[in-house]
Amino acid sequence: MSATLRLTEQLISRPSVTPLDEGCIDLLSARLGALGFVCERMDSGPDSFRVVNLWAKREGFNPLAQENRGQSATKSAANEGEAHTTPIKTLVFAGHTDVVPTGPLEQWHSHPFTPSHRNGVLYGRGAADMKTSIAAMVVAVEEFLAAHPQPGLSIAFLLTSDEEGPATDGTVVVCKQLKARGEVLDYCIVGEPTSVSHLGDMIKNGRRGTMSGKLTIKGVQGHIAYPHLARNPVHLFAPALAQLVATEWDQGNAFFPATSWQVSNMHGGTGASNVIPGELVVDFNFRFCTESTPENLQQRLQAILDQHELDYDLKWTVGGLPFLTTPGELVNAVRGAIHAETGLDTELSTTGGTSDGRFIAKVCPQVIEFGPLNATIHKINECVDVSSLDPLKNIYKGVLERLAGISGMAGASGLAAVADSTSSP
């Protein structure tokens, strides 16, 4: 059994449904601590929803700074300035140990928290999202440091048990603490399952923003046989709804599809068949690209409501802003490592839902997401091909080597022209 598979199984066997961690981070901290990582717990949240957070970092080796320690005071001061012109960069791997609920246990072919193998496939909750990614990166770092004990690259892990839930006490809390103390991050890989048909066929180099609204249209309740004595909020809202559905909010761009507006829930009435409702509650969501801002979308939507002279209350929640990492050092390193391992020229994409990348992008200039196939995430019988585990580990290790300047940069540079011209809406 490979080290990647063994660690993946150890993580799957822990029933870490949000916000529970069930010892995953203790297990990972022990592995990372043995490699020289300084592990900090940054747990957050009330006792009823306590979230386990880990920030673990191993500083890279700066040969210029090391040389300065043996120089005279005068020469050391001069060389120190030189060393500071080539700072050690930091690669962060971000992931979550929590998983979504299992759903009906009787529908699983094997227990979701008992790693099971059938026909070369590993089954278990979290197999794809995202315990395999975490295990692969930990083993990749172990192998990388065994071969290169003093790399010119700092490596960090940001792990949380609150990504699948409200995500209010997880990555966002750690990022705020890192920013407050001046921690500098250069690159981040979020281990989300991004592959579609084959490992490495797609990476996410950005995500759309998300903003939700709760709209209450006010009417006057009354008897359904006397509509002239009431004001039906459903009827009042209907013309505005049609206009909102037909509105083109923007046209997207080379990296993002156009902003979309969708109603998720609509409720009005008492349940009785002879009562005109007094109010209508509408839940809706924007998934927006970098061509729009929350403020602009709010203003435009409210202008439509006002145009129809509606009496309403509206509450907004901005869940995350869009982010985009254009082709550069990190994208090229990931593309080069994928190509070296699989022969694939990966596709850049910004499709899909939100992730913790939206928080990290505020403190790190280059953020991408890459992990195993996502076909079974959150489903009954979630699984991952065993044959993909070590290739995933090898790709992560290849990224480390490229960013540390150890190998593969010629291949990555060769892909740069492709990366610069490739985009996916």
From Swiss-Prot:
Protein family: Belongs to the peptidase M20A family. DapE subfamily.
Q: Which Gene3D superfamilies match?
A: Zn peptidases
User: Which top EC class is given?
Assistant: hydrolase
- Look up the record and name the cofactor or cofactors this protein needs: Zn(2+); Co(2+)
UniProtKB keywords:
Amino-acid biosynthesis, Cobalt, Diaminopimelate biosynthesis, Hydrolase, Lysine biosynthesis, Metal-binding, Zinc
Q: Which Enzyme Commission number(s) are listed?
A: 3.5.1.18
**Residues the record marks as active site:** D98, E163
Q: Which organism is it from?
A: Polaromonas sp. (strain JS666 / ATCC BAA-500)
| GO BP field | diaminopimelate biosynthetic process; L-arginine biosynthetic process; lysine biosynthetic process via diaminopimelate
**The protein's role, per its UniProt record:** Catalyzes the hydrolysis of N-succinyl-L,L-diaminopimelic acid (SDAP), forming succinate and LL-2,6-diaminopimelate (DAP), an intermediate involved in the bacterial biosynthesis of lysine and meso-diaminopimelic acid, an essential component of bacterial cell walls.
Metal-binding among keywords: yes
A molecular function annotated in GO for this UniProt entry is: succinyl-diaminopimelate desuccinylase activity
- Sites where the protein binds Zn(2+) 1: H96, D129, E192
**Would you tell me the protein name for this molecule?**
Succinyl-diaminopimelate desuccinylase
CDD domains recorded: M20_DapE_proteobac
State the PANTHER family in the record. Answer: ACETYLORNITHINE DEACETYLASE, N-ACETYL-L-CITRULLINE DEACETYLASE
Oligomeric state and interaction partners are given as: Homodimer.
Q: In which pathway does it act?
A: Amino-acid biosynthesis; L-lysine biosynthesis via DAP pathway; LL-2,6-diaminopimelate from (S)-tetrahydrodipicolinate (succinylase route): step 3/3
Q: Which reaction does it catalyse?
A: N-succinyl-(2S,6S)-2,6-diaminopimelate + H2O = (2S,6S)-2,6-diaminopimelate + succinate
- Give the matching InterPro entries: Bact_exopeptidase_dim_dom, DapE_proteobac, Peptidase_M20, Peptidase_M20_dimer, Peptidase_M20A
